[in-house]
Amino acid sequence: MTPEPRHQGDYTDRQVDAARRVLVDVAQVLAAFRNAMVVVGGWVPDLLFPAADPRHVGSIDVDLALDAVKLGDGRYAELLKLLLDTGRYDKGDKDFQLITTVDLGDGEVPVRVEVEFLASSDVKLKKNHPKLVEGFRVLRFPACAAAFEHPESIEFEGQMISGATNTVRLQVASLPDFIIMKAHALAGRDKPKDVYDLCYCLDEYPDAIGVVAADWRSRHEDPLVAASIQILREKFTAVEHYGPQQLAIFHDSTDDGERAMHARRAFELVQKLLSLL
């Protein structure tokens, strides 16, 4: 099992390129299930605003939230079968993931990419009997429910695992819902890229803070929104607190002034959002 990346330098061009090919590949294979799944995780910023400068670092895996309501009557099993039947995907190290390898054609070792499946904690996906993949299950993540509030349909072009160029469409978590999921992730694990993704979105998306604040105010009674606000208040109380320091860790600068600058920026972005709520 490969260690979780913690720094910007851990996201190499080869790994990101391979993961993007898998994203395109999955979008093509599961085109019939487009309305039953939403891209969450590290590819969301890249897909929502691909022309941003500086560019988002991307991701080295693919995270998909599954809509249990639309995956009844055995469609969940059918979704998995479509991927497995390509011969390109196998069971991963974790119960909720499939893996594939991508040959980038550069003479280097093929890159392993993980595809992970998530669902809200309050839903159940019907299992198939006999099981297609022994021990396979989706990862339960309460905030995953936010992905299905207002997903955006995104069309994008890229290479598939085979190297063929393709244009595909996927549902992608909206900016306000993505920030909800990232806030909840902050409360449940130690992954510096969560803060990088969150702050990148607030910094680069047009009027991001205003957009998120307006959406969250309209949903102030939503428990996921209320919890997100509380988490951000706790984690970003001051520059020295956990949230801002996570951004400094991700950028991994050896210069104390630069580390302080990143932490300060994270603190200011989140505090500006909180001030509007």
Predicted regions and their residues:
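Compositionally biased terminal segments of proteins
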Residues: 1-277
